[in-house]
Amino acid sequence: MACGLVASNLNLKPGECLRVRGELAADAKSFVLNLGKDSNNLCLHFNPRFNAHGDANTIVCNSKDDGTWGAEQREVAFPFQPGSVVEVCISFNQADLTVKLPDGHEFKFPNRLNMEAINYMSADGDFKIKCVAFE
């Protein structure tokens, strides 16, 4: 995957939400949204996989602590279609992150690193970001 958008100094605090809207490639295989302190310390690695790394139509989430990946969490809800415009909302709380998918389905991912703020975001893969909002 080519290097996509990287943003730092976000200072997203518990109770706040990150809303990302973008367009999926017509031949999308996967895309990634990372949130955390930096590229080696991620409280959320959000990776919808259409057909990548042995997974099909699966969302894989993980965390990375000082460069070491944690245990993967897989979600069976997969409301993404290649070539479509999608919006994902991620609410940050002290205990977990709540991910709201385009179809309204929500799931939680634990804040394993006990981060008190999210300062880093990156996006990569078959996803062209159109809008990022902080609420």
From Swiss-Prot:
A UniProt-annotated Pfam family: Gal-bind_lectin
Which residues span the membrane? none
**Residues the record lists as N6-succinyllysine modifications:** K108
**Which of this chain's residues are annotated to bind a beta-D-galactoside?**
H45, F46, N47, P48, R49, H53, N62, W69, G70, A71, E72
Q: Which domain of life is it from?
A: Eukaryota
Any one Gene Ontology BP term: apoptotic process
Q: Which residues carry this modification: N-acetylalanine?
A: A2
Specify the Galectin domain's residue ranges.
4-135
What temperature notes does the entry carry? Retains hemagglutinating activity up to 42 degrees Celsius. The activity then drops and is completely lost at 65 degrees Celsius.
This entry's Gene Ontology molecular function terms read: lactose binding; laminin binding
Q: Which GO terms describe its cellular component?
A: cytoplasm; extracellular space
Its biological purpose:
Lectin that binds beta-galactoside and a wide array of complex carbohydrates. Plays a role in regulating apoptosis, cell proliferation and cell differentiation. Inhibits CD45 protein phosphatase activity and therefore the dephosphorylation of Lyn kinase. Strong inducer of T-cell apoptosis. Has hemagglutinating activity towards human erythrocytes.
Assembly and binders:
Homodimer. Binds LGALS3BP. Interacts with CD2, CD3, CD4, CD6, CD7, CD43, ALCAM and CD45. Interacts with laminin (via poly-N-acetyllactosamine). Interacts with SUSD2. Interacts with cargo receptor TMED10; the interaction mediates the translocation from the cytoplasm into the ERGIC (endoplasmic reticulum-Golgi intermediate compartment) and thereby secretion.
Q: What is this protein called?
A: Galectin-1
Task: Please tell me the species this chain comes from.
Answer: Capra hircus (Goat)
Gene (UniProt): LGALS1
